[in-house]
Regions:
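Cysteine-centered catalytic environments shared across enzyme families
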Residues: 1-206, 212-263, 571
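An N-terminal alpha-helical hairpin/helix-loop-helix interaction module that forms a charged
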Residues: 2, 7, 46-51, 329-338, ...
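Short alpha-helical segments and helix-capping/turn motifs at coil-helix boundaries
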Residues: 50-52, 60-62, 134-137, 288-299, ...
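ATP-dependent adenylate-handling active sites, centered on carboxylate activation for C-N bond formation
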Residues: 154-155, 163-368, 385-438, 450-463, ...
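Catalytic cores of PAPS-dependent sulfotransferases
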Residues: 154-157, 399, 433-434, 473, ...
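PAPS-dependent sulfotransferase catalytic core
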Residues: 320, 434-535, 577
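Core structural elements
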Residues: 374-388
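Boundary detector for helix-to-coil junctions that initiate low-complexity/charged tails
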Residues: 567-633
């Protein structure tokens, strides 16, 4: 076992921006290196080096693949599109990157960039992540669809974009092809879990009272491994639905005879990022697309493998809005439209343009799946996809079998059962039949008629498991390091707090306020300041967009002959200065509130003017917070 690092002997590790992100410049194609950025699941193994990939490697993982052959450069990405591929074009020139901020920093030296105010408005108003599909905060840069593949002809300096047909939602439930694809998914992941367990016990799987984590967990039951040798994660506190989640998970654990939350199974020591590394990882992956920061200072020296139910909303009944419903949903988070009518207009523009983009990029587009497609192209890749990469840089491989492209070929319902929970009902009643007997949290359930029809289809197309799977057990000589880890926790918590405190100090600087209020106004900035003082969960989630908007607005205003090479952390240092007076802001707005005249700005939850509306807002906010309440270990 590796030595656990003591408080007084912390080992630092550096994040190298230039090796983790790239720019392919049309004028320097010969300098492009072949590389796999991120990780790929190939032939039931995790691959990090492009040399280890098979010719027809899989779509699963979180990666951008760059291959420089004799005359062709190929760029493609995973099924979810976790990084995003960002493209700038001007006449015959093009530049491509796997990081939006990295590309902007590269281009601003030589090209005039313009600010997309519609995007900035809509992102400020959004609940958690952008609901744009291809647009970005820079008008000249777009993010490619996740099924896009780039072919660059080096001799001609030309670029072709090809769209791969993933055949999403194409297979009818009442068909052999449907069940062949579903069983392929099941065998693939149970094999992967068994192979992984033979190598390591550094495995964590979530188990809650929800649909999505249970779909992933049943694969662990089907894999026939020793569950008491891994960490089965079920949070037991009073937040959100955690109490009920833990109660349900405990019943499942008792039924299948395993224990929850045995965190002392892990064998790994830690290295530590400095403050600037954490800030740069977050910024180059997620700004300006997402409002929460999950990366922290701890990096595992030995890899960890965390399984979850990310992306489950795409395989069940969840999103049922339509275009007008989406506009209404996002507008409901921005109540002060009399004061900010331009924000409402921007929301409408972004959603309508995104919906057109989705319809044009899908093969055989089906209106019945519009919401699912919108989720895949926006929230799924931005929220879950980018979180997967944040944790990857902590040496934590975040794995969701629900991301598998084979699963997304399947239709969610059919003419005999229009309930879009049919697919998950088939999964729950096909492989581990007892698993559906346990209740779900938060009032969730699957219609008994849907379950009955799922059982009918499973009988019509029976599951045949001819694999003789002996129990996989790997007993490590594991010491209980919990006391040592407790010694570390105080120092690590302090270091993580230093990162957030620094972000907060820059957000509260007079310079930040002056730049932001030149675009908006004092009321909006002050509302975000107040929200950051009252929000318990991710208190800076509305402050991060302010810092991102300011950065990219300044990038657009720069003279190209006066640009220094700076990282995002370097940029933040230029924004430091005197702080705004929070107490003065509080007094001003508390006084207005007593007169019941406080405007509700961006739906900040500390405002109580309209109780009914506030309750609706908090419910939406808390549901999304539950989705992202996973901590890398």
């Amino acid at each position: 076992m590796e030595n656990v690092i003591k408080n007084n002997d912390l080992q630092n590790v550096k994040f190298d921006i230039n090796s983790e992100f790239f720019v392919i410049d049309a004028n320097n194609l010969e300098k492009v290196s072949s590389k796999l950025y991120g990780f790929c699941l190939d032939n039931s193994h995790i691959v990090l080096d492009i040399k280890d990939l098979h010719k027809d490697f899989g779509n699963e993982g979180a990666y951008v693949y760059v291959k420089n052959d004799d005359n062709i450069i190929t760029v493609k990405q995973d099924f979810v599109g976790c990084y995003g591929i960002y493209i700038f074009r001007q006449d015959d020139y093009f530049a491509i990157s796997n990081s939006f901020m990295y590309l902007v920093d590269y281009l601003k030296k030589n090209y005039k960039l313009t600010f997309n105010k519609d995007y900035a408005n809509a992102f400020l108003s959004s609940n958690l992540e952008t609901f744009s599909c291809q647009e970005t905060i820079i008008n000249e840069i777009v993010v490619l669809e996740r099924n896009a593949i780039i072919k660059i002809n080096k001799a001609k300096r030309s670029m072709e974009i090809i769209h791969k047909n993933y055949q999403e939602n194409s297979l009818e439930p009442d068909s052999k092809e449907f069940f062949a694809s579903l069983d392929m998914w099941y065998f693939k992941w149970t094999k992967f879990i068994r192979n992984l367990k033979k190598k390591t016990n550094n495995v964590m799987v979530d188990l809650t009272g929800g649909f999505d984590s249970r779909i992933t967990f049943l694969l662990f039951l089907g894999a026939n491994i020793n569950l008491d040798e891994i960490f089965i994660n079920s949070i037991n506190d009073n937040l959100y639905t955690h109490k009920k989640d833990y109660e349900i998970a405990s019943k499942i654990a008792n039924h299948y005879n395993f224990k929850l939350n045995q965190c002392n199974k892990f064998i790994t020591s830690k290295s530590y990022y400095k403050k600037q590394d954490c800030i740069n990882i977050f910024a180059y992956l997620k700004m300006p697309f997402h409002k929460q920061m999950y990366v922290n200072v701890e990096k595992n020296n030995s890899p960890m493998y965390s399984f979850n139910g990310f992306g489950g909303e795409a395989i069940r009944s969840y999103w049922n809005y339509g275009i007008n419903g989406l506009i209404k949903k996002e507008s409901n988070l921005c109540y002060s439209m009399k004061k900010y009518p331009k924000i409402l207009k921007s929301i409408k523009k972004i959603i309508k343009r995104a919906s057109r983009s989705i319809r044009n990029s899908y093969f055989n587009f089906d209106d019945d799946y519009f919401d699912i497609c919108y989720f895949r192209e926006t929230s799924n890749r931005t929220h879950f996809g980018k979180a997967t990469l944040e944790w990857f840089y902590l040496n934590n491989f975040c794995l969701s079998p629900i991301f598998d492209s084979n699963l997304h070929k399947l239709k969610l319902s059919d003419r005999n059962c229009k309930d879009k929970n049919l697919l998950i009902a088939i999964i729950f009643t096909r492989y581990i039949k007892d698993i559906i007997k346990f209740e779900f949290n938060d009032g969730k359930y699957i219609d008994p008629k849907t379950i009955k029809y799922a059982q009918y289809l499973n009988n019509k197309y029976p599951f045949i498991d001819n694999q003789n799977k002996e129990m996989v057990s790997k007993s490590n000589n594991i010491n209980d390091v919990s006391e040592t880890m407790k010694e570390e926790n105080t120092d690590i918590e302090q270091k993580n707090n230093e990162v957030m405190d620094y972000f907060n100090s820059v957000f509260l600087s007079e310079k930040t306020k002056n730049i932001f209020t030149s675009l908006y106004d004092d009321d909006l900035y002050n509302s975000i300041v107040l929200d950051s003082t009252k929000r318990y969960f991710h208190p800076l989630m509305y402050a991060f967009p302010v810092l991102g908007i300011n950065k990219f607005k300044q990038d657009c205003n720069l003279k190209t002959n006066n640009v220094n090479n700076m990282t995002y952390f370097d940029f933040l240092k230029t924004q430091e200065g005197n702080l705004v007076d929070i107490n003065k802001i509080k007094k001003k707005y508390e006084k207005v509130d007593r007169k019941n005249k406080l405007l509700t700005i961006l739906g900040m939850k500390f405002i109580i003017k309209n109780k009914g509306a506030t309750k609706t807002l908090v419910a939406v906010e808390r549901e999304r917070e539950r989705e992202s309440n996973l901590s890398p270990r």
